[in-house]
Amino acid sequence: MSKQKTLKGSFSLCGKGLHTGLSLTVTFNPAPENTGYKIQRIDLEGEPVIQAVAENVVETQRGTVLGKGDIRVSTIEHGMSALYALGIDNCLIQVNGPEFPILDGSAAPYVEKIQSIGIQEQNAEKDYYIIRHKIEVKDDNGSVITILPDEDFSITAMCSFESKFINSQFATLEKMETYAEEIASARTFVFVRDIMPLLEANLIKGGDLDNAIVIYERQVEQAQLDQLADHLKVPHMDANKLGYIQHRPLQWENECTRHKLLDIIGDMALIGKPIKGRIIATRPGHTVNNKFARLMRKEIRKHEIQAPIYDPNEEPIMDNIRIRQLLPHRYPMQLVDKVIAMGPNSIVGVKNVTSNEPFFTGHFPEEPVMPGVLQVEAMAQCGGLLVLNQLEEPERWSTYFMKLDDVKFRKKVVPGDTLLFRVELLAPVRHGISSMKGYMFVGDQVVAEATFTAQIVKNK
């Protein structure tokens, strides 16, 4: 099972802000397990912190802007994209102004710094959200983001720029491992027709050809183009000649769409969990990206506890024979058939409930229902396997109940059900005492849960 990750150390990047033109420094720091992403405005009194989650986004017109009260932080998407793509789960980001520096207009400077400083694996397990069904969002501009079930994460972006100069494009990222090579250095881009109103409003004080691809694809008045050339500090151009206005050539023919894909990943970082699924984005932008991220957070809250994935064709980690070697239970009290996943702090087990179970004879003859006490016992046996598997000579130890708390039965368990148990250690085992939280699923539904404390005794 994958572990959460943070940075091995801190790093800083300095540059000017795209919108403000201010000289800014952003510092990325390691953070404890389960922190997520937090952004701190160290230039303000009290150094307030904003949790980087989708519902804290207050503006998406010219980028992703986080807000809390009167506090704002903008131009965060490139840094967030790099963190998410490189598997960083926990990070405290400190910035001394209202936006991150634009740098070269891509995520490459962040990726280079993260790779240089290194990534630290933490003890807590990474909490993936696994897509089990199609989820889709749309907006009035024809933008659509769809996510489908998949074993890993991948993303395809399709863009139509409504321009004769740039054709429709698509870009695909099949594996996050190729993000640094295929996506990170894709630069932000802007059309001349969109720049002119921003220039007149004095809103892109830090924009230049070092941090953006400027595309002249619709003719404007010569005077307007001259004004833009003066701002960009380039020679005046013929307003009749369309093309790219840039210092550096395109890295890829579809660099603009690759950057759109980069932005999607940055906005996805605000979901708060890594995702396993396949995203197909048509005409993406920060507004629909944030709408998608908000919907995903609602979906996650509805399914806070996800059932483990069970493929009966896969070989178990622990079969019935090995279970009998570790546990003293025998028929009819051995209630775990096999173990399909196990990490240092969690385990997933399986039991197939059949009509031949002896307890159905009296519970109840006309309406067979698995007794709740045996459901708890089954979860506890699974937890016992987790603890015993970490001991030397586990066959010489036994586990005994000490306490049960927060026991809940949500649905009947009947013949024909396949039970999935997910049991997690709540704290390291100390002085032979273990505390665990167990969930029992039928399909995607939680049917029972309990918190239990057990004692581990060497008795053989």
State where each predicted segment sits:
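Short Pro/Gly-enriched beta-strand edge/turn motifs at strand-loop
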Residues: 6-10, 317-323, 420-421
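Hydrophobic residues positioned within well-ordered beta-strands of beta-sheet architectures
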Residues: 24, 155-157, 349, 421-422, ...
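Active-site helix/loop of acyl-thioester processing domains in fatty-acid/polyketide metabolism
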Residues: 258-271, 339, 369-394
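Non-catalytic linker/capping segments at the edges of enzyme domains
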Residues: 302-369, 396-398, 413-414, 426-428, ...
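Residues located in well-ordered beta-strands
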Residues: 335-338, 403, 408, 422-424, ...
